[in-house]
Amino acid sequence: MDIEFVRSRFIKHFDGKTGNIYASPGRINLIGEHTDYNGGFVFPGAVDCGIMAEVRPNGTNTIMCYSIDLKDRVEFKVDDPQGPHASWARYIYGIVQEMKKLGVDVKGFNTAFAGDVPLGAGMSSSAALESCFAYALNDLFGDNKVSKWDMVLAGQATEHNYCGVNCGLMDQFASVFGKEGCLMRLDCRSREFEYFPFKPVGYKLVLLNSCVKHELAGSPYNDRRNSCENVVKHIAAKHPEGKYETLRDCTWEQLEEVKAEVGEEDYKRAHFVLGEKDRVLAVCDALNAGDYETVGKKMFETHYGLSQEYEVSCEELDFLNDIAKENGVTGSRIMGGGFGGCTINLVKEELYDQFIADAKAKYSAKYGKEPKVIDVVIGDGSRKIC
């Protein structure tokens, strides 16, 4: 993102005066899907694209926002009980309200912002927007007294309370805590986390966006969550001496004990989740050892599980995964909730050009459009630039 581009638009729309510039990144998740609501681990990293905002207090009670990308301007009062109707502005409004709850004495400000997170790629542009303004408000009005974790929770609460999205913590966590050259293992139960080195010399990390999103009848995500909870309930009934809250607490042996009772579908869902927990831990060990071949192997295993056990893949994503295998890609899997979106691929540099060319040609021939290619570089989290 170009600082001068954002600054020039800010100056144009707000009296020719400058403010402070802040940035927050989007994110990827290398491994650990559908584990958050099962009490498990996720493994995200911040990326080198995101949201950049220039912000300056204006001495009033009015917040004036300009979206550079949408060429749209919205104003609202700090204490407005309803907030703006524009969907993008509600993220800023929500962060203002949540930071006020944390004791930040937010006053009126002017802001212009832009983003270069690819839309529809599952890289969490909304979390980047929330995190950017949480960081800015903490700096400008809060004496930087609000902790990083409270900023993460403020972003999550914004989604819940003002945007109608019942999200987890991973997106905001990655945007706030990201560190260049590192991925993070987040324990979704305890909120403990650890940095792991991710400097794959000789490899590239790239997303292929299928450019599809299948709308399914019913509530496919809720159905899978219910399946997992049903398995836990049956295991808990067999082991009243233990404490079983999520699949995180269950063993492979206990899953086998209830296989007949829970039915094939629920068994497959739980089998994937237990396997994914093990795969995340295996990837941590592999990264510490600099073993990217094992990382890639676990990525392929996750794709198989998401496709065949959790059943959240689709024809297009499986097709891209098959192309990755055909081209000797080290690792490839669905990234995100499924039913469309991206594959995330770890590929050796010498194979990269051929892989991308083959994926574009074959996908275009079959589906009439090319997948979008998004090269990924692991970057820093939320920060003040100047």
Feature-to-residue mapping (PLM):
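Gly/Ser-rich oxyanion-binding loop with an adjacent helix/lid
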Residues: 1-22, 28-32, 37, 41, ...
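Short, charge-rich binding segments
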Residues: 44-46, 54-57, 103
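FabD-like malonyl-/acyl-CoA
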Residues: 128, 342-346
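Glycine-rich phosphate-binding loop
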Residues: 339
